[in-house]
Amino acid sequence: MAIVPEPAKEVMANYGDNNNDLLFEADGPKEMKCCTQNLDLGSLRNGSIQLQISHQLWNKSIRQMVSVIVAVEKPMKNPSSQAFCDDDQKSIFSFIFEEEPIILETCNDDFVCDANVQSMECKLQDKDHKSLVLAGPHMLKALHLLTGDLKREVVFCMSFVQGDDSNNKIPVTLGIKGKNLYLSCVMKDNTPTLQLEDIDPKRYPKRDMEKRFVFYKTEIKNRVEFESALYPNWYISTSQAEQKPVFLGNSKGRQDITDFTMEVLSP
């Protein structure tokens, strides 16, 4: 970086007052009273640049404060036939100041995945008061439990994730507490199917979950519904019969049960 030398005393002696000088500092130009050297702009050639040094009463060095004056039009005895216009300013400033491109960095999805995920533990029963239990390593069934068997009920870890949420639809995932299992929706035999999928606990849960794991939770009075985000109008459902697997159905409001009561165990 070039260093502006300190002006000699005899040069400073020839300075005069100019109340309209602008001083360019780190926080922007400021107008203030200062002592400046009287220079004849008419002696400058077209396109030349003059450095006007300001000598302040403050404790400022020449390196901190320099006024730049651009000779934009040479005074002439006869008035110019062409007025100075905006295009002339553009050409002068483009010559002095170099434009640099601004590079915008795209957001890395990893930061979204690493964001804290809000979760809560809960239990679900369908509107017929059937509880959801594990029947085998990868199957959920709905059945009525006696008081002594209530410990068999599955405890879900419901996580709030990204999705096309609205006022009454909240995107969530449903994992089983104590298991590396999540409910997910896949296509089998040309039919959307509900399954329990093994997951890597080091990667899940995360804010940006794959769509097959996401359900839109809708509250209707005191009950909730879970609609597949991947397959709209397909809901987590139970049969009216006892001990039948929990499945993904599209007969909402008919023979299949899509309404559940939710017991929150922890926020």
Swiss-Prot record:
GO annotations of cellular component type: cytosol; extracellular space; lysosome
Annotated family: Belongs to the IL-1 family.
Keyword Calcium: no
Subcellular location: Cytoplasm, Cytosol; Secreted; Lysosome; Secreted, Extracellular exosome
Keywords of this entry: Cytokine, Cytoplasm, Host-virus interaction, Inflammatory response, Lysosome, Mitogen, Pyrogen, Secreted
Keyword Secreted attributed: yes
Protein name from the UniProt record: Interleukin-1 beta
Subunit-level organization: (Microbial infection) Interacts with African swine fever virus (ASFV) protein L83L. Monomer. In its precursor form, weakly interacts with full-length MEFV; the mature cytokine does not interact at all. Interacts with integrins ITGAV:ITGBV and ITGA5:ITGB1; integrin-binding is required for IL1B signaling. Interacts with cargo receptor TMED10; the interaction is direct and is required for the secretion of IL1B mature form. Interacts with HSP90AB1; the interaction facilitates cargo translocation into the ERGIC. Interacts with HSP90B1; the interaction facilitates cargo translocation into the ERGIC.
Gene3D superfamilies named in the record: 2.80.10.50
GO MF, any single term: interleukin-1 receptor binding
Site description Important for interaction with integrin, residues in chain: 169, 177, 179, 188, 202
Function according to Swiss-Prot or TrEMBL: Potent pro-inflammatory cytokine. Initially discovered as the major endogenous pyrogen, induces prostaglandin synthesis, neutrophil influx and activation, T-cell activation and cytokine production, B-cell activation and antibody production, and fibroblast proliferation and collagen production. Promotes Th17 differentiation of T-cells. Synergizes with IL12/interleukin-12 to induce IFNG synthesis from T-helper 1 (Th1) cells. Plays a role in angiogenesis by inducing VEGF production synergistically with TNF and IL6.
SUPFAM superfamilies referenced in this protein's UniProt entry, alphabetically: Cytokine
Naturally occurring in which organism (per UniProt): Sus scrofa
Coarse class of the protein's main subcellular location: cytoplasm
GO annotation, biological process: cellular response to lipopolysaccharide; cytokine-mediated signaling pathway; fever generation; immune response; inflammatory response; positive regulation of canonical NF-kappaB signal transduction; positive regulation of cell division; positive regulation of estradiol secretion
Miscellaneous information on this protein: IL1B production occurs in 2 steps, each being controlled by different stimuli. First, inflammatory signals, such as LPS, stimulate the synthesis and promote the accumulation of cytosolic stores of pro-IL1B (priming). Then additional signals are required for inflammasome assembly, leading to CASP1 activation, pro-IL1B processing and eventually secretion of the active cytokine. IL1B processing and secretion are temporarily associated.
Propeptide residue interval(s): 1-114
